[in-house]
Amino acid sequence: QALARGAKPIMWSPVERTALAEAEVEYHDRKVPVVWVKFGIDFNAKPIRSRGDFLEISELVNAKVVIWTTTPWTIPANQAVSFNPNITYVAYEVEEVATEAELGFAPYAAVGDRLVLAENLASDVMSSAKVKRFKPLGTVDPHGWTLEHPLYHVGDFFQHAIPMLAGDHVTADAGTGFVHTAPAHGEDDFNVWLATDHTAQEIRQIVDADGRYTDDVPEPLKGLDIIVTSGKKRGEAGKANNEVIRLLAESGNLLGRGITTIRDAHSWRSKGPGSRRATPQSFIARDKPVHAGKTLRELAMKAISDTEFFPPTGRNRLSAMVESRPDWLISRQRNWGVPITLFVNTKGEPHTAALPKDQADKLNANIKAAIEKTGVDGWFATPLESFFEGTGVSAEGWEKVTDVLDVWFDSGTTHAFALRKRGIIDNATGQADVYMEGSDQHGGWFQSSLLESCATRGMAPYKQVVTHGMVVDAEGKKMSKSIGNTIEPDEFQKQHGIEILRLWTASADYWDDTRISDEIIKGTIETYRKLRNTLRYLLGALDGFTPEESLLSAHPREGGDPVRPEAPAFAGESGVESMPGLERFILHRLAELDSEVRAAFQVFDFKRVMTAIVNFVNVELSAVYFDIRKDALYCDPSFATSKAWDEETSVHGNRRRAVRTVMAAVMERLLCWLAPVMPFTTDEAFGESHLKGSAPSVHLLLFPETPAGWRDAALAARWEKIFRVRRVVTGALEVERREKRIGASLEAAPDVIISDKALIDAFAGEDAADLFITSGAVLVQAASGPAGAFALDDTPGIWVVPRLAPGIKCRRSWKYFDPATAMPGFPDITPRDALAVKAWDGAAG
């Protein structure tokens, strides 16, 4: 019902000799000629009424209606002049014009000229025509006027009546208040022509497919091109404009001329200007019922409202296009493509609409059989009569359409043959999860897919639409080989590797145009190196890690450990509650991060994913957690070697076990979260990790579930207080290191003065020296610190007095300790280190 054939002014590319869809049109600034043209009033055509306060007929003798156009080549196709009944029109008489000596050329206007213009535009028009002084004669009513063609003198072809047509598309914002109307070359012109009791058959087609005047147009215009279609000047203005302007001047109907810049339609392929041209084409009507009594426009607008868009602005853009778009032009005039398998009768009706359903079905079956036998060439090669055999319809009076389908129509059917036909989604109600393409596809693939699916199924083919911008250079300029600012993906891959390109994409605001340059890529490489090194560090730290070691997967021992029967049971060995506060804080952050990463992935916000992960790696892992827990990781008794299970050894052994448990949880989540962005790196790390036996590839793992019990807001608040103090201590130690008063932070044992008791209370149960990575630390509450104490302006109420750590340096952990506390047989290492060595020696036999 919605498929129709008809002649309409559609965008045409003379360079390519084909119609253009809206999606194939781009707009560029172009300098064009502008002319003001006079149309004489034909008083003999039919009586002109005088009424009310309007001028008498006698006062309009020799008056001419003025139009303005930037397409002089369309003047030969003029068939009417349009006006708006709501605009006030006035007849003026020219009293003085600029002289040739003043201008350097002879003006086209002359004293005594009578010109009809919109009242509020008269001054601008007169100025453009170099008129110095003019006077109003009175208001006029153009209803019923008939005009003479401005090329009347060229020959009989132009000696036809030019009616005045009332139309709402005429405005008084610019121009003259009258609109030159060539229904073959303008959509508004076409519509007002049909709306005023004229027919499409009366429209003059004087420009051929090559953009040249046809042989119907008299000399000297016949055969002139409106656009150069070949050679070095391809796409430039042809000879038609200049010749039309010359003829207008010769006839005395040129009032003024100039040059202006307009935003003009160009073919996105050839880059040449397009022009509107009325030709027989195939259309899908937007406002006729196509499914369940709903029009295509109604169905599409409803489908858009039911679809998720990322970014959300995509909905507004697509809605605006669908809401305002005219009927869908689906035919093209090319030597290749999918044929439009229609026959049209002498009325221009397609067989699908003109024939009874049973006959149309038989004809369609013959078409299908021919194409199945020999391919799409079967449509063109099979004689017309053969298609009509056995249909009960005579082939006489029918013509085969040789146009091909718009390629956007082809692409818009991908959901049908790529998903529905293959059974991936339900044929009637199935939808693709997501369509992703560039922002230019709101007028292309997104829209053609939407319209095709709505027309056939009444619904969108997708649940979600994701739009990305284009890649631009560091200055925001579009990449162009002529400018030399392009980056070739092949060369990029050879130099940096494809993971860097993926990481750059995921880290950028890809919804908008995205900048890329060597400097930007350097930053991406640093980010990649940091992430890769973090995974490498975790691989080393987790060497030999097994599920039995995990405090999250083990169970509290009842009467002994099945893995190590000799180990006694003790309460709280398993589970989050058994872990030190710092480990529980990292698990809390993993739980927070898990929610954020999942939510961001859900809405395709990859930058948010990467920002959250990179900040976590840089700030909380590398700068804090890994730094603090190096001592426990390197020096605490290990799970595998602990044999001496007295209480102290258990505590130290459990801490290292907790560290490795948390690192394993971090490793698993980082691998899974980063896998979509860094597939090679994560799969390589997965193959070397403790997880390698759990799946053939990291890409076959689901995101691990993160227990709600890991979240602990109160604990997180406590650790935020600890980190605030630690930041000031770290700053003080950096000064000491810079001044060479210490070499490493373990040489220090600072005094920390804190005014807020809540900050001191936050350290309850924690070893401040471990957290500061010093050999000792004293926390003191006081209203202020001593003179000369280190402080940070942005962290008031905390002061640090650096002091050297007393005692001797542990040969194993490098911590300073009181030698009097050393265990027998281990005089030069701390008691903790002595326990670790004993455990190691015991395990070694």
Question: How would you name each of these model-derived features?
Answer:
Residues 824-836:
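Cysteine-rich micro-motifs
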Residues 80, 87-178, 187, 191:
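Protease-associated
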Residues 38, 43, 156, 168, ...:
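Alpha-helical recognition segments enriched in aromatics with Gly/Pro capping
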Residues 2-76, 96, 141-146, 152-157, ...:
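Residue patterns forming the tRNA-binding/recognition surfaces of aminoacyl-tRNA synthetases
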Residues 2-30, 124-133, 142, 148, ...:
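Amphipathic alpha-helical
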Residues 314, 396-408, 426-444, 484, ...:
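Secondary-structure capping and boundary motifs in well-ordered enzyme cores
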Residues 10, 14, 18-28, 346, ...:
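Acidic, turn-prone loop/beta-hairpin segments
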Residues 13, 267, 345, 391-395, ...:
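Short cysteine-rich clusters marking metal-coordination/redox-active sites
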